[in-house]
């Protein structure tokens, strides 16, 4: 995928993301969103990775707690929680041919620790499906968001 394809379709990708997430906003070519499941909130950041020429899905996990009508959230880095997010009843939530390689890295744009689905997988997926333009981004988002949300 070429960078200009991503840049030209950021608004369209943000539209797809709004179907599963809240508080979706864009800043130039970076998309920020929140998704909640149970007592977990995912802080999601999507942007174009120039080296791999593919979109990159990054996220952080926040544990939500309510006590005496006060909601608090705590940043969590826990492999058990990652395993819970990407599995359902002990089985991967995505196609078994896909290894959702989730790693913890310093975010290349924000400089804070985030989990990421490795961009080489995004590049390979987009190459395999051979879609172009906004259709490729919609396919990519639906495929990988199904792992987390």
Curated annotation (Swiss-Prot):
Belongs to the ATG10 family. Keywords: Autophagy, Membrane, Protein transport, Transferase, Transport, Ubl conjugation pathway. The active site is at residue 120. This is Ubiquitin-like-conjugating enzyme ATG10. It comes from Pichia angusta. It is a peripheral membrane protein. It comes from the Eukaryota. One of its GO terms (molecular function) is ubiquitin-like protein transferase activity. It is found in: Preautophagosomal structure membrane. Its EC number is 2.3.2.-.
């Amino acid at each position: 995928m070429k960078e200009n394809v991503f840049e030209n379709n950021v608004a369209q990708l943000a539209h797809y993301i709004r179907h599963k997430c809240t508080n979706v906003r864009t800043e130039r070519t970076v998309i920020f969103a929140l998704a909640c499941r149970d007592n977990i909130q995912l802080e999601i950041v999507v942007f174009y990775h120039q080296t791999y020429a593919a979109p990159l899905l990054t996220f952080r996990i926040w544990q939500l707690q309510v006590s005496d009508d006060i909601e608090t959230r705590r940043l969590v880095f826990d492999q058990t929680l990652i395993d819970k997010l990407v599995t359902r009843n002990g089985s991967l939530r995505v196609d078994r041919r896909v290894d959702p390689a989730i790693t913890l890295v310093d975010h290349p744009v924000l400089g804070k620790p985030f989990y990421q689905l490795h961009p080489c997988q995004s590049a390979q997926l987009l190459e395999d499906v051979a879609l172009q333009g906004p259709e490729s981004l919609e396919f990519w988002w639906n495929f990988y968001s199904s792992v987390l949300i």
